[in-house]
Regions:
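Short glycine-/acidic-enriched loop or helix-start segments at secondary-structure transitions
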Residues: 43, 94-95, 125-127
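Short, polar loop motifs at secondary-structure junctions
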Residues: 72-73, 117-124
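Conserved catalytic cores of phosphodiester-cleaving nucleases, focusing on short active-site segments
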Residues: 56, 60, 73-102, 114
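Domain-level recognition of nuclease-like catalytic cores that cleave nucleotide substrates
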Residues: 121-144
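Hydrophobic/aromatic beta-strand patches that form the interior of the parallel beta-sheet core
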Residues: 84, 115-117, 133-135
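Short, glycine/serine-rich, charged loops/turns that create anion-binding
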Residues: 38, 67, 89-91, 121
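Accessory nucleic acid-recognition modules appended to NTPase machines
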Residues: 1-81
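Short, conserved loop/helix-junction motifs that constitute active-site signature segments
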Residues: 106-110
Length: 144
């Protein structure tokens, strides 16, 4: 039943196996594994972009902030006003196009720093006062 699923999810969250991330407007939640390797072993589908997103969130735990998500940002903090987008394979030109599309939402939420985390690309640019930073995961995980 639905209730038993919710109880099981809550139990896994309380035992630090999973982490639930709330949507900023709707009553939706995404589930991430604290140990992303466990997630990879349990899932039949080995989608690298989802695994990379889980890896990025694992690194964000060190900030000890509450993060939210929406259709524009994988993670953002309402306190620090920083948004993070997991983009392992997008090139700089596609990231700049995506930045223009998400700019109105960033301004609406008061976010003035958007960080794209990639496998290896790096760049930095401004649009209407919002800093868009493209950094490699290794630099991100070391505290850029």
């Amino acid at each position: 039943s639905k209730d038993s699923v919710y109880q099981a999810i809550k139990k896994l969250e309380n035992t630090y196996v999973i982490y639930t991330l709330k949507h900023d407007e709707k009553k939706l939640q995404k589930i991430y594994f604290k140990d992303f390797g466990l997630r990879n072993n349990l899932c039949i589908s080995k989608d690298f972009s989802h695994l990379f997103e889980n890896l990025v969130l694992s690194e964000l735990f060190k900030f000890k902030e509450e993060f939210f998500y929406n259709k524009y940002f994988n993670f953002y903090s309402q306190i620090s006003k920083i948004a993070y987008i997991s983009s392992p394979t997008l090139d700089i030109d596609l990231i700049k196009l995506r930045a223009k599309k998400i700019l109105p939402k960033a301004l609406e939420l008061g976010i003035f720093h958007v960080i794209f985390i990639t496998l290896s690309s790096e760049d930095s640019f401004f649009e209407q006062g919002v800093k868009f930073e493209v950094i490699s995961f290794d630099k991100f995980s070391l505290g850029f």
